[in-house]
Amino acid sequence: MFKNGVDTVVPEPIPSRVYAVCQYIKKHRGQKQDIMHAVCMDDVFTASDNSDIFNHSLNAAVELGLVKGVDNEYSAEEALLGINSMVDFRRYAANEIFKRPESLIFKITSLYCEYAEEMLQYTKWEQVVESLGNHGLQFPYNAILGWRFWVPFLGCGYLNDTVMLPNWYVRFDDLLASQKEFKPGQMVPIKDFVEWIEAKCPEVRKSRKETQLGLGVSNALRTLEAMGKVKLERQPDSLQWQLYRFEGSNDISHVTIAR
């Protein structure tokens, strides 16, 4: 699901299922079959349905480094002990997943972010797959069905029917909540702030063209300002970068961190 160079993004292991498996194993180490019967609803799904869903979800947990299996017995990795909520899980998963630039989920996200404006004109996921293929990334249709569940959860946008609206607000907000590089009230030059963002979120790097920020990053910065998390400054004597075009001024020279 998340491995470098392995095209195995599938729709079954949605975030809530992977989280449920992790939380059960955190409290109850055990054999694979016993864990499956404990976390799956046998009276709702057929045995084969449960097996596919569970196996993919368990594999995703292992690939994220949260669960380990030895001789068919599964237990919690140390990283799982600090995950006590879906927010904890989201922050950990985003950090792990986007460390892997050769994984299919990273490549789809990066390319979608780079060509975000084009992606918004499509009304079917098949069109998105075809378009990304035209930009050099070939992958099976089934992969986009898995991707569409994970990327909004990781904080990179909002799912609206058959389109993912690119907005990295949640992902950036998660980073700001735990960062120690900037002090409250500090006015940070936009160049420094973007370099920090791109180091933490390498999936957005290709969306920027010199000093022109891409749609997903621009949406995130505007949302952060609207939520009172940052203030976008326009100092006349400073180097100006540009947010993705919108009504009013799109120039920005500094980002002030909220107190």
Predicted regions and their residues:
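Donor-sugar nucleotide-binding helix/loop cap in glycosyltransferases
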Residues: 1-259
